[in-house]
Amino acid sequence: SFPTRRSSDLENQLNPDHERAHWVLLPGNARKQYLDLVKKQEKLEEVSSKSPYNYLEGLNPEYDYEFGVIACGIGYNYVKEADTDSCHIPVLKVSQYPLPAEEIRTMADRCGYVLVVEDGQPFVEEQVKAILSSDYEVKGRLTETLPRTGELTPDNVGEAIGWGIKRPFGKPQVVMPRPPALCQGCGHRDVYDALNKVAAEYPDARIFGDIGCYTLGALPPFRAIDSCVDMGASITMAKGASDAGVFPAIAVIGDSTFTHSGMTGLLDAVNDRANITVVISDNLTTAMTGGQDSAGTN
């Protein structure tokens, strides 16, 4: 018989909700559920204002400050690291959404402007602007006080705050760049060698890659794949290219990615009798993300 996992293997006990209206999202139920979410949002805002994970440091209500900082995640660490002179400015650390609106207003009332320090997209900055009126100046990535793109560093955070951090030494020139590469002995290498030999005979050949360590086939010395967008896209992009007249259109996908999100694309390609070649490069493991079991390795 086919082995199954018993419920005793689960870490937590079940806590089932038998109210079907919570789970059957017919239009009438969905409208009610959305109203419940709106009401929960008000409660979450109240919880956020009292959360120990959102806290305001260094604000003296009797003082006026040139600026204050709202920071989250690694941005908060960089603010503290850049604060080499223990400059006394208020810093609001935020750790959850919705943001603590009252704390934001309290700090903004005593500051000339607010600097938002966050990694990634300027989500918090946009939320802070929505909370504060146009009378308050908010700076951050959107104003390019911090770089609009790229990662935060202690250096660019320190520069934005105006503390002018100077590093005692630069990056050693003797350290040569080491771009990522497929491991020696990896079977993906042989796949790309073979594909390159075949593609050399077809000037219009296109090879569509997928998500996995085999994506490194786009780099030297192979330079074998022409695209990599998201998991499963290799097959659907190859089909679309073939439908548009590309020949040969070849998809390269790993075994784990194929079982994750490649099977539906292959089903559609077979159903439409698409003139494509699908290569499932099976390296017998989920190599890129930790070696965990998957339907492709069990």
Enumerate the predicted regions with their spans.
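An acidic intrinsically disordered interaction segment
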Residues: N196-D210
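Flexible, low-complexity linker and terminal segments
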Residues: S1, R5-L182, G187-H188, E201
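Short, well-ordered loop/turn and helix-capping segments at boundaries between secondary-structure elements
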Residues: Y113, A130-S134, D272-N275, D282-T285, ...
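Well-ordered alpha-helical segments embedded in enzymatic catalytic cores
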Residues: K43, Y78, L99-E103, A194, ...
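Thiamine diphosphate
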Residues: R206-A287
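Short acidic, glycine/serine/threonine-rich loops at helix termini
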Residues: R5-N12, K80-D83, E103-I104, E125-K129, ...
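Acidic, Ser/Thr-rich peripheral helices and adjacent loops at domain boundaries
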Residues: D9-R20, D226-A233, S294-N298
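Conserved phosphate/anionic-ligand binding catalytic regions in large, soluble enzymes, centered on
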Residues: Q184-K197, M231-T236
